[in-house]
Every structure is written in structure tokens, then in C-alpha cells.
């Protein structure tokens, strides 16, 4: 956490080719002259840093307290959610911070074939962001790619809700009856 907080002052832009929340926010804050009010964006950056850290902390506490079945699919979807959510809401992120979410997206596609559009969408947005560097091209659809990742996060939250929180967990009885003692 400390390296992230010290690097916040080193960078001026709220995002560096990463398809995150600031692609969307920066588009909203354009003025009529085409200039961006950087002071407002920096304040938003600090606010979203607190929001991102707080939301992640609350979600981690909720996951810790919620009794849900621990299996490979649940672990993959939960890890994928956090690997995608954290660089999406934190400011000053480069596109390379989405690499972990790309890895979990591949695992998610194989674990949930019917929901593979979520993983494909995030990998596409990440690839579009990464592809600008070797070809020295401008990432022209930053807003749209940010919206694609936002939609993927919402869909992934729906998968988590369905798979983890709405699924009935088997109830263990408080005490097991001894054989034959119940009938006597």
C-alpha cells in the first residue's frame, strides 16, 4: 500500500491507457474548450482511492464472515472479481495492472463456459489498451473500453451473487443423533 500511495504524487494523469473508471470520468469532465480540469480529477482520484480501498476492505470482511462453499469455481470467480475491480477503481493505474485479471479471465472462461463473454470482454479491453504501446497508436476508444470493463464487473458481481450468496449451503445439524437412541 505504501508504494502505491507514494507513487500517487509522481504521476499526473489518473490513468495510463488502462480501461478503468477514469476513462469514463475524464470524458465527463471535458470543458467546452476541450480542456480537462485536472484539479477536479485529482480530487476525484483521492476520493476514488478511498472508495476503492474501502469497498475492497468491506467486501473482504463480507466474504470472510459469509459462510459460502469453497471450491475451485468460487475461488476463481472471487479472485477474478477482485483482480478486475481493484485496478478499475484505483487511479493512476497502467494497463499492465490488468494482467492478473486477464489470467483469471482465462480460468473463468474455462470454469464458466456459458458466461465466457465476461472473460472475453475484459481480455479484449485489456488487449486494446496494451496494443497501443508497440504500435505507438492512440487508444481512441478509452471511454468504450472503460464501459466494457464496467459492464463485465457488473456481470461478474451477478455471477458471484448467484453462485456464492444465493446458493443454499448445506446445514450441518447441531448434534448427530446416536444410532438407535432416537427411537428408544
Regions found by a protein language model. Give the residues of each.
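Transmembrane helical bundles and short interhelical boundary loops of multi-pass, membrane-embedded
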Residues: 1-14, 22, 58-61, 79, ...
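Aromatic/glycine/proline-enriched transmembrane-helix motif characteristic
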Residues: 7-89, 163-165
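Generic hydrophobic alpha-helical segments
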Residues: 28, 107-108, 131
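Membrane-embedded alpha-helical segments of multi-pass membrane proteins
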Residues: 50-52, 97-105, 143-151
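Alpha-helical transmembrane segments in multipass membrane proteins, preferentially the mid-helix core
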Residues: 58-62, 99-111
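Active-site lining segments that contact anionic ligands and/or coordinate catalytic metals
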Residues: 73, 95, 119
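Short, contiguous acidic/charged loop-to-helix segments that flank catalytic cores in large enzymes
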Residues: 87-95, 109-112
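Membrane-interface catalytic loops of GT-C/OST-like multi-pass glycosylation enzymes that act
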Residues: 90-101, 134-141
